[in-house]
């Protein structure tokens, strides 16, 4: 179904003509998940996003559907259980997006190590138990020092004790958002990007009955009426709530900044994802991850109070991450000049909650007796000598023996909250990208109840555990063969097998729609046929309105294909200008915007300071 600039125009027109059941403010993963479930459940749904979809937090993650093994250091079992359960659901409803990737976790004999070899084995066994992983090759494996170095010979050898391998999943975060958005659009939701909420419409009792917004592309004010409004703006949640609390600061959110850096794979060669202690005795771990022909690593985790729209990578961030990777990979000698791209994102953490974080510091202490008892019980369970109930009981004993420490940025809860203010505004905040579906389900359960109680409207919530996102109509047990079948179809449209396979992996069950565009398109000047199809599909079916939307979020060109990016800039802008009938002034403005984003990602300013 078309999802284009014209779709946007019609959506804004219809939003101003209706009294929606639900208006969603925010088009990141949380808002996208709410929109999908609301529209599929029959609610008259609208969604506005002030930037591009996923432009804020949801395209700036570590790009994993992460199981959270790190939580098991302190036996935050409930968190890991929820996370791996939801990860399995995401695999079911978006099978073309998460891809299994065994993660290597080296263990070093040094102060502040997250795991000893023994604790790592216990944690991995518990992790597999919670994830339902029981058979090879997915099951975890303990490695000797020699086996770790055989896998990753460039790792630091000094102090290396061994390691482990466990199952994790890589993710395309921005694609997960847009596929949820597209499905919501197909089910009737009215959706528009680049529309900013500016204030609430209130009735005589100071209850919200809609939103005053501004179309940032035309600078026109828009009035949208809705029975209920939900705030899913992540780091901006407090700002939206502030509309009706003027003069009364709201501090529910405590954003932290996470930075990732990208270098060429030859500069930092890793054959598989690596998750390793920083070696700085700061209680933190970093990921070093291969993607395309690049390697990226991160993340930092620091409190943030700056510009929410444009968080920047600082010299301090770069120094920290380069220090870590050069310590763990001593022969790499990565410098700032090797950095090809980067991103800084804000985590929408909630204030006032303490828990351990998969990248974070130790937030609690487990007594030796509780730990030993849990270890013995898990071992007995694995040997079929004890029950799952016994494991659960031992886990509860560990949880009750845990004492909290003072919060640091990495120990703030990744938990979510769903609140309703006195004026009727719902706010769904916090959480991890893996939890988005469950968060939306909880919110919609409450919203549907309120619609019945306050407005006499009844809806049945869709079973979102089995409701695929756009592109996700693939058998989860047969993903590789179905993707390959789509790729074969692409070759019949004149694509090379490599290009067809790339597009099939990117678009899943929507790949035939992409290939069908060859009936009306030929390769644009300066672009391959595959690139031309991808660009036009993004413009007509994914509401890509700007070059940055295409290069950074509909594809990963700007992050992981930096070598070929420069050659694509002019042809893509030319094709978009032709498609959207841009004036010369608009075309120049779009190119300037793209080059500014590229300069930010390339760290041009920091590199220039060093040269100066």
UniProtKB/Swiss-Prot annotation:
The keyword Cytoplasm applies. Its cofactor is FAD. GO terms for molecular function: glycerol-3-phosphate dehydrogenase (quinone) activity; glycerol-3-phosphate oxidase activity. Pfam families: DAO, DAO_C. Keywords: Cytoplasm, FAD, Flavoprotein, Glycerol metabolism, Oxidoreductase. Residues 398-408 have a biased composition (Basic and acidic residues). Its EC number is 1.1.3.21. Its main location: cytoplasm. One of its GO terms (cellular component) is cytoplasm. FAD binds at residues 21-49. InterPro entries: DAO_C, DAO_C_sf, FAD-dep_OxRdtase, FAD/NAD-bd_sf, G3P_DH_FAD-dep. It catalyses: sn-glycerol 3-phosphate + O2 = dihydroxyacetone phosphate + H2O2. Signal peptide: none annotated. One of its GO terms (biological process) is glycerol-3-phosphate catabolic process. Disulfide bonds: none annotated. PANTHER family: ANAEROBIC GLYCEROL-3-PHOSPHATE DEHYDROGENASE SUBUNIT A, GLYCEROL-3-PHOSPHATE DEHYDROGENASE. This is Alpha-glycerophosphate oxidase.
